Amino acid sequence: MERSTQELFINFTVVLITVLLMWLLVRSYQY
């Protein structure tokens, strides 16, 4: 259970960082 939760948390963090980076790139590109 803990491993599952940890994996899910890591995946969520990676996705969040990726989305944030893409958003910053798009924003700086448009700006």
UniProtKB/Swiss-Prot annotation:
Q: How does it sit in the membrane?
A: Single-pass membrane protein
One Gene Ontology BP term is: regulation of relaxation of muscle
Q: An example Gene Ontology cellular component term from the record?
A: sarcoplasmic reticulum membrane
Lumenal topology ranges: 27-31
From what superkingdom does this record's organism come?
Eukaryota
Tissue localization of expression is: Detected in both cardiac and skeletal muscle (at protein level). Highly expressed in heart atrium, red gastrocnemius muscle and soleus (at protein level). Detected at lower levels in the extensor digitorum longus muscle (at protein level). Expressed in slow-type skeletal muscle.
The disruption phenotype is: No visible phenotype at 22 degrees Celsius. Increased heat-loss and failure to maintain body temperature at 4 degrees Celsius when the shivering response is prevented. Mice show increased weight gain and obesity when kept on a high-fat diet. Mice display faster muscle relaxation rates in soleus due to an increase in the affinity of ATP2A1 for Ca(2+).
Compartment(s): Sarcoplasmic reticulum membrane; Endoplasmic reticulum membrane
So which stretches are on the Cytoplasmic side? 1-7
The alphabetical list of record keywords is: Endoplasmic reticulum, Membrane, Sarcoplasmic reticulum, Transmembrane, Transmembrane helix
Q: Which GO molecular function, any one, fits this protein according to its record?
A: enzyme regulator activity
The record's listing under InterPro entries reads: Sarcolipin
Principal location listed in the UniProt entry: membrane
Give the transmembrane region(s). 8-26
How is this protein organized at the quaternary level?
A: Homooligomer. Can also form heterooligomers with other sarcoplasmic/endoplasmic reticulum calcium ATPase (SERCA) regulators ARLN, ERLN, PLN and STRIT1/DWORF. Monomer. Interacts with calcium ATPase ATP2A1/SERCA1. Interacts as a monomer with ATP2A2/SERCA2; the interaction decreases ATP2A2 Ca(2+) affinity. Interacts with VMP1; VMP1 competes with PLN and SLN to prevent them from forming an inhibitory complex with ATP2A2.
Q: Family, per the entry? A: Belongs to the sarcolipin family.
What does this protein's UniProt record list under function? Answer: Reversibly inhibits the activity of ATP2A1/SERCA1 and ATP2A2/SERCA2 in sarcoplasmic reticulum by decreasing the apparent affinity of the ATPase for Ca(2+). Also inhibits the activity of ATP2A3/SERCA3. Modulates calcium re-uptake during muscle relaxation and plays an important role in calcium homeostasis in muscle. Required for muscle-based, non-shivering thermogenesis.
The name on file for this protein is Sarcolipin
